[in-house]
């Protein structure tokens, strides 16, 4: 009864040794083909023939301008990338049999995508704006407006805003303040003083002239002058008579003496008597 199972086991072992079971997985850097684990071609080499039971995998190196950068079973190598100068590209690093060409943009340009298949010119910051961040091979220029005290008078993709000139540090005077597009204008100190002193002197002279004109007009106005009288003493003769003649007042016209004719009596107006 026990012979039959034992015979089956023996026959199974015999068959498995004559016809081994094909492998289901291969080691690292191998590939499975035709129930065989064949070695992969090393980087920089391409596959020519798969391995057999009696031969190893056959590989050949990539030609000039070609590369393969991994262990592979590729039958063709990859072509190096072409850095087209018409698209603004240039070769930064030549490729080898295991590396590709590295393309970058020419000076003053940046890539339009991560793959960097073409380039465009940097954006320039216009006057009144300065460069906050200079463009790189993969990013464009970032501009910012010039703050107070700084200016930019050119369109540039590299220049930042520059500070206004400090005239006092050069022994000069500021004649015109700067703007976001222009620098401060400096000049000699003497000129600035003249610009200040001359208007002041002209103002003083004008005021003096006005005073003189006013005084002259006041002098020309007619003045009401009271008649001047002058007491003229006269000697009284010790002549006999009932009524001696009193002293005669000489009336002055405009403070000038007026002669009285002989034989005429001096008369005093009624108002003066009152």
From Swiss-Prot:
Q: Where are the TNFR-Cys repeats?
A: 25-60, 61-103, 104-144, 145-187
Under the heading InterPro entries, the entry gives: TNFR/NGFR_Cys_rich_reg, TNFR_5, TNFRSF5, TNFRSF5_N
Known role: Receptor for TNFSF5/CD40LG. Transduces TRAF6- and MAP3K8-mediated signals that activate ERK in macrophages and B cells, leading to induction of immunoglobulin secretion.
Tell me which parts of the chain lie in the Cytoplasmic compartment. 216-274
Disulfide bonds listed in the record: 26-37, 38-51, 41-59, 62-77, 83-103, 105-119, 111-116, 125-143
Per the UniProt entry, the signal peptide is: 1-20
Q: What is the organism field in this record? A: Callithrix jacchus
Q: Name one GO cellular component term.
A: external side of plasma membrane
Q: Which residues, renumbered to this chain, are glycosylated? A: 153
Quaternary structure, from the entry: Monomer and homodimer. Interacts with TRAF1, TRAF2, TRAF3, TRAF5 and TRAF6. Interacts with TRAF6 and MAP3K8; the interaction is required for ERK activation.
Listed PANTHER family: TUMOR NECROSIS FACTOR RECEPTOR SUPERFAMILY MEMBER 5 (PTHR46875:SF1)
Q: How does it sit in the membrane?
A: Single-pass type I membrane protein
Q: Where is the composition biased (Basic and acidic residues)?
A: 261-274
User: From which domain of life does this come?
Assistant: Eukaryota
Per the UniProt topology annotation, the Extracellular ranges are 21-194
Tell me what this protein is called: Tumor necrosis factor receptor superfamily member 5
